[in-house]
């Protein structure tokens, strides 16, 4: 590149010298110029020979001087300009040799011209003397000034913008129209055709008509407009029960072969469902259990089903749907007491009718779950004492093993009346009003005002047959938790918290026999009647072995049985009030004085080691009620005691979080200063 520039500079200087000589000869003004034609002829062919290559290759970038010399290629040139360079490099030696010849010829011509120029007439010009240029001298100089370039076109200027080559085809600086910049013949190729671009989405008139049934079946596989298979097409209720209960799966699998609901209305026994995990639901209980699965599912609001079920299913069934099939097993429990009492058979048949009577003064047990609104509350309140009583009343008869054989000594003391009375009343009678269980429980009211969840479960809920009544068998449930958990539900910590008990009339006391007396479960003080009865919760109670204590409320016509082992009751040992009882002894339970004396105080009679405490009385805080003492146990008549149900505390109103506006700016700055100072 440097050699090429040097050569061009030399050629440029030579051409300048030629012009100077021409102007000098012209100013001499010689009239006859014999040598001029020859010199001009010799020069003209040279210029003519040298000019064609110049014209053929116009300069790529014009220099400041305006001379159309060969372009000095910039470093930014692309492959196109490199091809042009090859041509230029071939033509350059030719140009230089021609210019040198011209210089050699011009030198003698000028020498000859000088002496002869004196005789030439000024202002007269010879034709063909080589001076007849079409433009006057002024125009030549003005042409130089016209070629004055802008800063961005001048290569010597730092603001020069190279515009040649592929790299600069989009450089639009200083250009008004694109045609100058865009290289010709370079059009962007189309990558796709736009002709049929929107054919798939075009509006076609012939497609707007409704399709025929065959077309619908070919497209969708079935006729989406037909109302015959409306079971598959009708929109489902979006709200499904949580934890997809097995009832949902049964419903889907049994749909084709499911019999209609007329069994429920007519009372005809329907074939049993083939499930093994149920408690063998009898024929007449299938009706209610089927209505709940409809109720819990998504078909509740359809008119076709409303005609079949005139009465809506009971809320207890809706609750059970969320709990799954485990809750249903407790409802179906009452059915099989046929093994126990054949006379209960007609009573059960009308039980679905009883369930639907909502306006009874004292509703039967299945009506109580009306208050359960949500699944989580069902889970929590399932362990409540009243609820365990209800569910246990349904299940225990079927699940309890038959009582073990009674020893003859005990059998002699037992009268068959309690057994029959208890068994006949397991099922509520078909008539409205109070059932047998409710009447029995109203006599055996247990106050639950100071109920402690940590107590051992020696107080069984209602409906559980007393082991004392059933004959000397072991207690069927050792723990209240065992009864509550029997539904297959995991016992949670939240179920052990103290909650308001719904109905205080739901409990009576199951008096355990001391064969199964566990001293570890009698650690706390036993409830005693005193001035502040609610201060000590009931801890449990025991009955001495082989003795039958008849409750005056249940069997008022029986004489009290004799105590067969009176030597277990030791004489009371009196201690000074300040002296603590011996360490190994139990805390002092309620000890009654001799049978004809009432003892309402807080006694401090510890027992000597090895002695068992006598059973305390029924746990009633009302000490003024009439009471009877049988065999060292004080019984109170519950009918004369008004037990006030403990009102549940009102729900705490959720108060919104108050959002205070930020303090004003000046106070904030003051506080910041105080903090920084401190």
Curated annotation (Swiss-Prot):
Residues 124-133, 258-269 have a biased composition (Polar residues). Residues 1-412, 637-678 are annotated as: Disordered. Belongs to the CASC3 family. Residues 14-24 have a biased composition (Acidic residues). Identified in the spliceosome C complex. Component of the mRNA splicing-dependent exon junction complex (EJC), which contains at least casc3, eif4a3, magoh, nxf1 and rbm8a. Forms homooligomers. Required for pre-mRNA splicing as component of the spliceosome. Core component of the splicing-dependent multiprotein exon junction complex (EJC) deposited at splice junctions on mRNAs. The EJC is a dynamic structure consisting of core proteins and several peripheral nuclear and cytoplasmic associated factors that join the complex only transiently either during EJC assembly or during subsequent mRNA metabolism. Residues 25-38 have a biased composition (Low complexity). The keyword Cytoplasm applies. This is Protein CASC3. It comes from Xenopus tropicalis. PANTHER family: PROTEIN CASC3 (PTHR13434:SF0).
